[in-house]
Each structure stands twice: as C-alpha cells, then as structure tokens.
Amino acid sequence: MSRPLVALSLGLVLFRVLSAALFVTQPGFTDAYYYVDVAARLAHGQGLTADFIWNFLEAPRLDPLPVPSHRFWMPLATVVQATGIAALEPVLGVFRSAQAAIIAVAAFVPAAAYVSARSLGASSRAALAAAALAGLGGFTFAPAWVTLDSFAIAALVGTMFFVVFSRAAFGDVRAGAIAGALVGLLFLARAEGALFGLALVALAFRRSSRAAGIAGSAIALAIGLAWLARGLALPGPAAIALAKGVFIVRYEDFFALNPNGSADLATLIGVRAGALWSDLVVALAALLLFLAVPLVLGLRAGWRFPAVRAFAALALLIYVAEALIWPLHATRGSYFHSLAAFYPFAMALVALGGETWLARLEQNARRLATAGTLGAVAILAVFGLTNWDASFNVPYRARVAALEAIPPGPFLAIDAAAWRWISDRSVLLVPSDGPETAACVAIAYRAQSLVLEPAHFSAYQSLYDGNGSPWFVQRAESGAIRIYSLVRNPGCPSPDQIIR
C-alpha cells in the first residue's frame, strides 16, 4: 500500500471519528437500533434473539419473549457490532464499541476503491481521487459509513467482489471461490446481495471460466442455504417474511397482525412505476448528480473489463428487482441501502472517466477540476452529516424527554427497536390493525401503556386526535408524543384466533 493511500486512509478515519463524535451519537433509525439491540444480546451470550418485537413476523403467534431475531433483516451487521461490543464495551460502552467495529470496516473502503481504480487501468493519482470520493461519501454516504447498519460492510464486500470477479472471469478458480465467499457475505449483509451470485452463474456457462464460476456459485449457495435453513428451522410459518416483504400493497400492512390490503392491477403497476422513478432519483442523488457524467465516461472507458460489465448488469438488475419485487420497501430505504455495495466501485469508474476526459486539458486545469470535485464532495459530506443530525438526533432527544412519562414495564410503540434502546425495556410493536388489536397485544405481553408519536398508523389517528378509545385513555403528553394506559380488555381470543 502506497504512503499517499495510507495517509489518505488515516485522514478519512479521523473524519469518520469526528463524524461519529459530533453527529452520529446514537443509532438513529429502526434498522440501526435493531442491529445494535440484538448485537448487545449476542455479545453477552444470548444468541441471535430479541427481547422486543419490532414486527410480528418475528412473533407470528405472539410468541413469548425473547424471540429469534433476523427473520427479515440479515445478520452480518449485528455480528460485526457484537464483535466490537465483546472487545470494547468495558472501555467505550455498547454504542461506541459497536460503532468502532463499523468504523474499522469503513476504514478499508477507500483502499478498496483505490484497488478497484488501479485494476481498471487508472493512474495512481486518479485512484487516490477514487479513494477520497468513496471515503468522503458525499451527502448520502458520509453519515452512512459510521451508522450501525450494513452500509460500510456492503461497500467493502461488494467492491472486493468486483475486483476479484475480473480474475475469476479469466478462469482463476481460487478467485472464483473467493468471489463466491464474498457473495455469501454480501447476502448476509443485505438480502439482495444474493443477486450478485448470478454473475458467477454466468461464468459457469463459459468454457474458459466454468470451473471458477462453479466454485464460486457453490460456495455462495452453501452460505445462502445455511442461513435459509436457519430460518426454516424457526417456529412459525416460514413464508410470512416473504409475504410481508413482497406481496403487501400498503406499507402499513407490513406492521399488521392481519394484513388485509388489496389493490387492482392498475394500483400494483402504479406502485412499481413510482418505485422505478423514485429509485432513479435516489441513485442520482447518491452520485451527487455531477458525478453521473464521469461515471458514464468511466463505463465506456472500462467496458472491456469483465468487472465493469458485471457492475453495470448487477446495478441494473438490482434497480429493477428492488422496484418491481419490493417496491414499498425500496422507496423507504431498501434501494438506498443496496447502493452501498456499488458506491466505491462507482467512484473508481468516476475517477477513470474523469481522468480520460481531463487528459485533453492542461495540467493546472486538471488539478483545479480534481480539487474542485473533491472539495464539493467534502462540503456535501458535511451537509449530509448536519442533515442526519436534524433528521435523527432531534427525534431521539424528544423520545428521551418523554421516557419519564411512560409507566414502568413493557409498552407498545411504533418503533419498538428504538424505544427498546432508549428505555432498556421490552417494547412491542403497535400493530397497524388498530387499538383493539393493540389492546390484545398489550394483554398478551402484560404491557399497560401505548406510546403514539406524530408518525403513527392511520388506524390510530382518532385516538391521537383525542377522540378516545374503549381500550386506551391518555395519561401523559411530552411534546408531540402521547402516552396512553390500557383500561379495558376487549375480550381477546387466543393468538391463533387473533391471527388469521
């Protein structure tokens, strides 16, 4: 590794530490809360289990706590964070030790982008620019690299897949096996990572790379099947995660005990068309718009490389799959998450395309253009961090302020993973079915309180507006957060009768 790359990587690590210290001071959003909640239990020897219910697909029959975790989300982010907690909790505490593990992974993202750019024929200067672009992350990924999520993990694993894939495409069996292991790891970080395995399957159909493709596909398949077998072994219907992930037509139904939404063909098509447009905007935003042109130039310049063709094919495949198969999830963060696996390699292509285009200019003009681009990305990164602060730290402080108004014991809330972290108590999801079902959930788990925030399911609007409910009465208010007490049993049947 060259000295300039080492110096740049260390500088970017410092930038991440400052980002974490000043802005990303708590998990922030549901995914991250979930990962670290379970990571703490895993680090303390309690396995992949949760003592809260963020979604009823993890407690399909209102199963007693703790329940097996990760029926929907993938486990690698939790495992990485648990490693940090096990090693550093006595010194840094749970949150900072989990975050330290993520920052350690993110520290290698610039180097991965550098190696990618060099593998495509870019000069060392252009490769350093790619490393800086990937490391800074711009408006979208600057905070993502230090959040307790899968962004940094997917970025590193996905980028190394493209680097190794080129060698596998020329018949290197060892490279094919490594690529397969990377696909397996990417799948354990993000479910759509399994689609990367199709690139290895394609190699198996070519005589020159057949052995490499078969080796990689077999390893990726073995890892994937092992995780799927774990899911099948858990109690409850295994198809529930698929049904809630793919077949819902209203996003609220994802959080219902009994999803009952229906839609005609026009609505189904409209939702997917909307997701295609929304995801395109997200992709352009992740590229900071002005990097889209050098990316296209980089694709043209590097098209002769198998990794570049695989990058283009997989990027298009995942864009279409997210919008058509998981449209409701794609437009609520899933597609943005999937872009992390592509981002550093995309920055390598941006550097390659930029170098190709700037070659026609004088040296001073090239330096000015490069410095201007990096400066703009750095400024946008700072804006991204301040936006993260406003988007996630402000609601966090409101929840902390409301905590003392919530009576002791378990309670119901719309973001159970977040409230579990904040309250250090068992928290159950407020079912989107409505207050009557919520009362039954509360009784099943011996909870006496329900918390409603400004963002709540439509079935609770009347209760939130103060119109009352036969089962809950308001007992306290903290800002826009309202706390209700359970006052009546609606005559709940058994869980098997509640859940159809």
Residues of each region from the PLM?
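Signature aromatic-anchored transmembrane alpha helix within multi-pass, membrane-resident enzymes
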Residues: V6-S9, R125-A129, A181, L198, ...
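Membrane-lumen/periplasm interface segments of specific transmembrane helices
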Residues: F15-S19, R210-P294, I318
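Transmembrane-helix motifs of polytopic, lipid-linked glycan transferases
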Residues: S97-G121, T159-V163
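Membrane-interface alpha helices of multi-pass inner-membrane proteins
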Residues: A130-G135, T159-V164, A175-R190, G197-A204, ...
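Hydrophobic/aromatic-rich transmembrane helices and adjacent perimembrane loops
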Residues: F151, V157, R309-A310, A330-L361
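Perimembrane helix-loop-helix junctions
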Residues: R167-D172, L195-L221, L228, R300-A301
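Hydrophobic, aromatic-rich transmembrane alpha-helices
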Residues: V201-F205, G274-Y319, V350-T356
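Membrane-embedded, lumen/periplasm-facing catalytic core of multi-pass transferases
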Residues: A369-R420, S426, P431-A444, E453-P454, ...
